[in-house]
Amino acid sequence: MKKNTNFTQINNNFYRLVDDLFLKIEDNLNFYDDKIDIDYEVQDYVMTITFLNKSIIVVNKQESLRQIWLATKFNAYHFNYKIDKWICNRSNKDFWEIFEKSCSIQSNENLIFTAFKRIKK
């Protein structure tokens, strides 16, 4: 049986994109580590973020759909990777815009994440 190398390449690329996103999320959360109480745990591509008020946000991958899902206290979002960004399939907003606003609301803090402002090298 011939191996489908195109599928493998797409799958590997998806995991690289997800890994990159999760690392950027961690970098941004760690920036606030000594300023506010934010805990996060990553297990099997599911990141659970818990704020001091016990409010939770979950970020996870949906491999079969090639999507990132974001679950907040108020809504759920599905993101597809388009033109170097994770874009919400309903609102067409960037992941970082929604994630930053959701974290700010749920933590009762004005959080500003820099990952979406970084220039790609």
UniProtKB/Swiss-Prot annotation:
Keyword Ligase: no
Any one Gene Ontology BP term: iron-sulfur cluster assembly
Protein task: Involved in iron-sulfur (Fe-S) cluster assembly. May act as a regulator of Fe-S biogenesis.
Name by which UniProt lists this protein: Iron-sulfur cluster assembly protein CyaY
Keywords: Iron, Metal-binding
Gene: cyaY
Family indicated by similarity: Belongs to the frataxin family.
Entries under PROSITE patterns matching the protein: FRATAXIN_1, FRATAXIN_2
Domain of life assignment: Bacteria
Keyword Iron among UniProt keywords: yes
Signal peptide: none
A Pfam family the protein falls into: Frataxin_Cyay
Lineage of producing organism: Bacteria, Pseudomonadati, Pseudomonadota, Gammaproteobacteria, Enterobacterales
